[in-house]
Each structure stands twice: as structure tokens, then as C-alpha cells.
């Protein structure tokens, strides 16, 4: 994985500029800035005060996840921010190209490498998560796209009160992960605390030899957006969603404002 990610981190993250895109499995905006999800306004019940077990039903934006899609033509890198609209966690479809995310009969609880004639896809983390997938799909040639993604089955019944903690997995990609010049990407952990009443999320992404990335976000519907900061890496932005019944899992992406690093993460409610 380390060697195959070099093309992604050295060419894509170093020149991370968002462009318009299309996907047979999703949609995109047409600006050069990161796309903003359409947010559903959440209105508390006027007749009853919510109890600790209350949920908000149907608070799902139409997209089910997103990806950074990196292509290179004539030494020029282009990056597209794709939104997925389907909830098939076994497959991605980008620009008509289908990418397998699971193998039948394989129930690994850790990172899984899936190869085909076009891509090498590293997916987290098999049977460990029931409602979301996150990973990196790397092309076998310079004319194909590289993809950093998360996708799942969005929560339909978001909690409106209470606290929850999530722990899970992450991947950080950067030219400056550590003193080891050959190490361009590392797999690690994620940890988040959520206040559903205040609609806030905070936490961190960590990985061996990589600086900790601290996450702070606001929740709208079943999605969240916010900032990603580190004492050793440049500041960035984060996006993500809650997945499964009663927000049992979450997933998302983050990247630096100066495009020097990118990250994906997933987590499970404890």
C-alpha cells in the first residue's frame, strides 16, 4: 500500500484543487471550492419535549458519501469532489467505472486489499462496520483515477439529545507524515465525542508517526462539517455523515487548506 499511494500523495495532495465533476453514482458542484451539502433544517417537536431516546426521523441529505477523485493528463492534476447518491456499501461507481469494496465470503475486521485489472483498493474495515466503508482506490496506470472515499447507509433517525463516543479507524496521506521519506500514508485510529443536543462533534485522527489531527464540527441533519487542525500540519476542513440505525457509525474525509495532506476516517458508537 505504501508504494502504491505515492502517486496519490505526491501529485494529487500537493496540487489539490477542486474541479467540477460528474458521476453515474453521484453528483457534484461546479465551483472550485469544496462543495457544501444541502442541509435540512431540523425543527424540534412543538408538542413534546424530546426524551434522551428521542430521534429526528428522515433527517437525511440526499448524498450517501463523497470522494476526492484525482486524475492526471499531460502532467496536469485535476481533482473532483464527487457526492454519492446510492447506499451500496459493496461498490463505488465513479464516471461509469465500478470499484468493488468487498469480496463475498471474506469478513476481515481490518484493512482489506482488493485488486482488479484497473485498481488496487484498500478498504476499511470489513465486518467491523456494518453501514459504512472508507478507503483509497489507486489506479494501476497514469491514465486512471485515484480515489479517497467514504460511503454508507445514512442514518434516518438521528438522536436529538444525549452524548455518544465513537472509536474507529483512519488513514492519513501526506508528503510530510514522518521522518521516513518513503512513508507517504499511514493507517491509524479515530476517536470522537458527539453532543446530539448541542449538535457538535469533536475528536481526533491519529496514526503511527503522523501528527494528530484534531476535528471540530457542527451537525446538521445526519451530516457534519467543520475544521481539522494540527500543531504540525496546516489547518484544514472536514466533512462527514452518520450511518446506520440511531447514528451507530460515522465516516468522513478531511484535507488541508493548502492541500498538503488528506485523510479518511470511520468510527463506531461505543
Predicted regions mapped to residue ranges:
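C-terminal motif of bacterial Sec signal peptides marking the signal peptidase cleavage site
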Residues: 17-20
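Bacterial N-terminal signal peptides that target proteins for export
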Residues: 1-9
Amino acid at each position: 500500500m505504501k508504494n502504491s499511494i505515492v502517486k496519490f500523495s505526491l501529485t494529487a495532495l500537493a496540487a489539490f484543487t477542486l474541479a467540477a465533476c460528474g458521476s453515474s453514482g453521484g453528483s457534484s458542484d461546479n465551483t472550485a471550492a469544496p462543495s457544501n451539502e444541502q442541509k435540512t433544517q431540523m425543527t424540534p417537536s412543538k408538542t413534546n419535549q424530546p426524551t434522551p431516546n428521542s430521534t429526528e426521523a428522515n433527517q437525511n441529505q440526499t448524498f450517501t458519501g463523497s470522494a476526492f477523485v484525482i486524475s492526471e493528463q499531460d502532467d496536469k492534476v485535476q481533482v473532483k469532489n464527487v457526492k454519492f447518491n446510492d447506499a451500496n456499501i459493496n461498490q463505488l461507481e465513479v464516471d461509469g467505472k465500478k470499484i468493488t469494496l468487498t469480496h463475498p465470503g471474506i469478513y476481515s475486521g481490518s484493512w482489506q486489499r482488493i485488486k482488479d485489472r484497473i485498481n488496487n483498493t484498500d478498504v476499511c474495515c470489513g465486518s467491523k462496520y456494518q453501514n459504512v466503508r472508507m478507503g483509497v482506490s489507486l489506479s494501476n496506470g497514469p491514465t486512471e483515477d485515484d480515489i479517497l472515499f467514504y460511503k454508507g447507509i445514512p442514518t434516518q433517525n438521528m438522536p436529538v439529545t444525549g452524548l455518544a463516543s465513537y472509536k474507529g479507524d483512519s488513514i492519513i496521506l501526506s508528503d510530510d507524515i514522518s521522518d521516513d521519506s518513503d512513508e507517504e500514508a499511514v493507517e491509524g485510529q479515530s476517536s470522537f465525542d458527539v453532543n446530539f443536543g448541542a449538535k457538535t462533534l469533536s475528536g481526533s485522527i491519529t496514526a503511527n508517526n503522523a501528527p494528530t489531527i484534531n476535528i471540530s464540527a457542527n451537525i446538521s441533519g445526519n451530516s457534519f462539517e467543520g475544521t481539522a487542525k494540527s500543531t504540525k500540519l496546516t489547518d484544514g476542513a472536514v466533512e462527514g455523515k452518520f450511518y446506520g440505525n440511531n447514528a451507530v457509525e460515522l465516516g468522513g474525509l478531511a484535507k488541508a487548506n493548502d492541500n498538503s495532506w488528506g485523510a479518511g476516517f470511520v468510527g463506531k458508537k461505543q
